[in-house]
Swiss-Prot record:
Function, in words: Fluoride-specific ion channel. Important for reducing fluoride concentration in the cell, thus reducing its toxicity.
Originating organism: Pseudomonas aeruginosa (strain ATCC 15692 / DSM 22644 / CIP 104116 / JCM 14847 / LMG 12228 / 1C / PRS 101 / PAO1)
Activity regulation annotation text: Na(+) is not transported, but it plays an essential structural role and its presence is essential for fluoride channel function.
N-terminal signal peptide: none
Primary location: membrane
Any single GO CC term annotated in Swiss-Prot or TrEMBL for this entry: plasma membrane
Residue ranges that the Swiss-Prot or TrEMBL entry lists as coiled coil: none
Reaction catalyzed: fluoride(in) = fluoride(out)
The protein's name: Fluoride-specific ion channel FluC
């Protein structure tokens, strides 16, 4: 149990630090759709797709690795709450087009990146 908790905690800390860094460095570049938040969600989508494909092909790997990468790192990196707050802020400002664009970009982009992660990992593994 402690190994699982440690794996999740370590992964979450690393993911959250990366998300914080991306926001710090990028969000001021385009405040309407903060690129740090978007990049965190897109990278997280790719990583989780690649990880799912990899772990499906390597069932003998210790489950703590899956917890570290998928539950911890991707959970700490991706951010539905920040994305939601940014969209609500746009709606409150009456910027409906920007809000719709942010929703479309985050959701479709994250789904496409997850698929890309799955396909690219399967390709690298020769599957």
């Amino acid at each position: 149990m402690w190994k699982s908790i440690l794996a999740i905690a370590l992964g979450a800390a690393l993911g959250a630090l990366l998300r914080w860094f991306l926001g710090l460095k990028l969000n001021s570049l385009l405040p309407s759709i903060p690129p740090g938040t978007l990049l965190a969600n897109l990278v997280g989508g790719y990583v989780i797709g690649a990880a799912i494909a990899y772990f499906a092909q390597a069932p003998g790997i210790a489950p703590e690795w899956r917890l570290l990468i998928i539950t911890g790192f991707c959970g700490g990196l991706t951010t539905f709450s920040t994305f939601s707050a940014e969209v609500v802020s746009l709606l409150q400002e009456g910027r409906l087009g920007w809000a719709a664009g942010a929703i479309a970009t985050h959701v479709s982009g994250s789904l496409l990146m997850t698929l890309l992660g799955l396909f690219s990992m399967n390709w690298m593994l020769g599957k």
